UniProtKB/Swiss-Prot annotation:
Complexes and interactors: Homodimer.
UniProt organism field: Xanthomonas campestris pv. campestris (strain B100)
Classification of source organism: Bacteria, Pseudomonadati, Pseudomonadota, Gammaproteobacteria, Lysobacterales
Annotated substrate binding sites: 9-16, 22-23, 61, 88-91, 99, 115-116, 184-185
HAMAP family hit by this protein: PGAM_GpmA
Protein known as: 2,3-bisphosphoglycerate-dependent phosphoglycerate mutase
SUPFAM superfamilies: Phosphoglycerate mutase-like (SSF53254)
């Protein structure tokens, strides 16, 4: 039996538009982002996808993307589970900074390493910083010292995988069709795990906003196929635009 999983990166956020490092900062969608969410829902509807359960992060840009997509699908009633483990990678001291200005200051290669390498985190945010998640009450039940002040993709994967194994994978194994609406790097982490690609290969992977990525999995959740819904060239262009965000102007 083929299991279906869709990974959907949130639509354009205000800080995507402003070309700023966002991380765990709770920035909302732009009007374009809301349109992308609806368009993603239409693509999934045209594909004939009937979901059984959905998962998202605790950040509004992902939550609102999921809501917009489900409305277009006419599946607003779907059970939705939110977890901080699906949050974007924490960008530490880079959060809020302009990506192009940071590239001009530190060099495009260094910014590419911070953005796209597997195991090198950006400079950390101190736990005493008001922007640290330890001061945000949505994480009040968690150990403040266990919350990240920065993350690499490797540590993001370590954070995401327990939720995959404990919450998402059992639903897929039970034959459920699953939608995960999250963020560029939490989804890159899942992509790496599912496709078992190398640390070097993940450096070149960019996930565009608002375009559903459909996986077909076997009974053991091994990948049989995967593809972006809609126009493949449009998805390619959107991914290239993501890659160019870290370049100096």
């Amino acid at each position: 039996m083929t299991r279906k999983l869709v990974l959907l990166r949130h639509g354009q956020s205000q800080w995507n538009l402003d070309n700023r490092f966002t991380g765990w900062v709770d920035v909302d969608l732009t009007e374009q982002g809301r349109q992308e969410a609806a368009a993603a829902g239409k693509l999934m509807k045209d594909e004939g996808l009937q979901f059984d359960v959905a998962y998202t992060s605790v950040l509004k840009r992902a939550i609102h993307t999921l809501q917009g997509a489900l409305k277009e699908l006419d599946q607003d009633w779907l059970p939705v589970h939110k977890s901080w483990r699906l949050n974007e990678r924490h960008y530490g001291g880079l959060q809020g900074l302009d990506k192009a200005e940071t590239a001009a200051k530190h060099g495009e290669e260094q910014v590419k390493i911070w953005r796209r390498s597997y195991d090198i985190p950006p400079p950390a945010m101190d736990v005493t910083d008001p922007g640290h998640p330890g001061h945000d009450r949505r994480y009040a039940t968690l150990d403040r010292n266990a919350l990240p002040g920065t993350e690499s993709l490797a540590t993001t994967l370590v954070r995401v995988l327990p939720y995959w194994h404990d919450a998402i994978a059992p639903q897929l194994k039970a034959g459920q069709t699953v939608l995960v609406t999250a963020h560029g790097n939490s989804l890159r982490a899942l992509y790496k795990y599912l496709n078992d690609i190398s640390n070097a290969q993940i450096l070149e992977l960019n996930i565009p906003t608002g375009i559903p990525l459909l996986f077909e999995l076997d009974d053991n959740l091994r990948v049989q196929s995967y593809r972006y819904l809609g126009d493949p060239e449009a998805a390619k262009r959107a991914a290239e635009a993501v890659a160019n965000q870290g370049k100096a102007k």
